[in-house]
Amino acid sequence: MKELTIAERCAIPRHPMPHQDPQERIRNFNEVAVGWDRDTAVEEARRCLLCKNPQCVVNCPAEIDIPGFIKKIAEGHFLEAARILRASSALPAVCGRVCPQETQCELTCVMGRKYEPVAIGRLERFASDYALFEEELPVPEPAPPTGKRVAVVGAGPAGITVAGDLIKMGHDVTLFEALHQPGGVLVYGIPEFRLPKEIVRLELDVIEKLGVKLVTNFVVGRTATVDELLEEYDAVFLGNGAGAPSFLNIPGENLNGVYSASEYLTRCNLMKAYQFPTHTTPVARGKKVAVLGGGNVAMDAVRMSLRLGADEGHILYRRSRTEMPARIEEIENAEEEGVKFNYLVNPVRFIGNDTNWVTGVECLRMELGEPDASGRRRPIPIKGSEFIVDVDTVVVAIGQNANPIVASTATGVETNERGYFIADDDGRCTKPGVFAGGDIVTGAATVILAIGAGKKAARAIHDYLNDGKWPDTIGK
């Protein structure tokens, strides 16, 4: 295949991702984006300008050699592309699906200055899937054993990354997960139609083949304390996420039919409530469902409600579409599926019937004022604008908080006023030998930011195991 000129690369249009038809996909839980074939992936890869100073790499928390793996796809060497991805990331097939590339690597793609950026995320998905389903990538040999042992708490994106990187460095790694299935938010929070659980399982299989020991149903803070783990291991990484739901604290929030997004999605994703009674966990299958919030979790919840049989799925959001934190792709998918978006509305109370089941949400209309600390325009209530949205199920998706169980048994590991661990940029906590990263440090954020935190922490843990040095300025 001949080398293309820059002009020829620029002349190739960005390839769209094929999707299931919206009216078909709301009747199933299959992945919405169906993926590319080889020819499409090669053609898209040939758009890459192979920059000498690739800003896409600078903007990738997982530190992936993006031009390197894309070049291999363009040459038809798909397994080599996957090898480059796995050298930097334990979860490339996951990231190819859920990472917000449009605000990170693709945002700084030089092609995007005049044309559409190279579809880096879709190419990452293609190459990673190739190695999972078509031609298995040989497991690399780890470094010689160091004799050092590391406990990783939480088998979510940060913990999986730390475990995968440290095992390659020759350390003995045990990954502890509180639930019966590893994956963290990847399995309990993100629906099957956006991230198939098989993908998570296969990527976990890879780090287990490398030698990571996985222990499920192990609740750090109950089964064992952080202090007890430190007696057995040379270092401990805390990546237990932000799994405790936030609530509005308005009247009626304890009515039947009102769920936190955490409970609603966990019942559906992890417990397979949509297969009740084959699976024993039920969930309300409302016909008119309101989801409160504007992030990716809210989009996941409202789209889940449609697949559970809702006639109407509503988003109630107190700002406008412009301020919505959800990925534009997820908003557009929800719009295609018929979700009704109610902007500039704020719930003030839930209304119930004589059986204590929710029947309505009373809202106030809002207008936007000056930007607040988040940089988004602050919503201001319009006096006397109350109205009621009739519903039979409500999902509150306004954020997550730190679960205090782990911190309560971590002597000397300080938390901030919101219960998140205090750590430096490399994940070192206020107690020597204890590291933390991901949502339990930053608050609820993206999968890729948790992966980036995991990579930094893994390097810091490796350094600590080698030299034993610990800064005395953390938290000061």
Please identify what each model-predicted range represents.
Residues 254-286, 371-444:
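FAD-site-proximal beta/loop scaffold in flavoenzymes
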Residues 25-44, 64-97, 114-144, 268-269:
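Ferredoxin-type iron-sulfur electron-transfer modules in oxidoreductases and energy-metabolism complexes
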Residues 80, 144, 149-153, 201-250, ...:
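Feature captures the FAD/FMN-dependent oxidoreductase FAD-binding
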Residues 50-75, 94-127, 174, 181, ...:
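Iron-sulfur cluster-binding cysteine motifs and their immediate structural context
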Residues 127-144, 202-222, 245-308, 415-426, ...:
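Glycine-rich dinucleotide-binding loop and its adjacent helix/turn
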Residues 149-174, 298-306:
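N-terminal Rossmann-like FAD-binding beta1-loop-alpha1 element of flavoenzymes
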Residues 440-465, 471:
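A conserved FAD-binding loop/helix module that cradles the flavin
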Residues 172-175, 179-210, 214, 302-349, ...:
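Rossmann-like dinucleotide-binding cores of NAD(P)H-dependent redox enzymes
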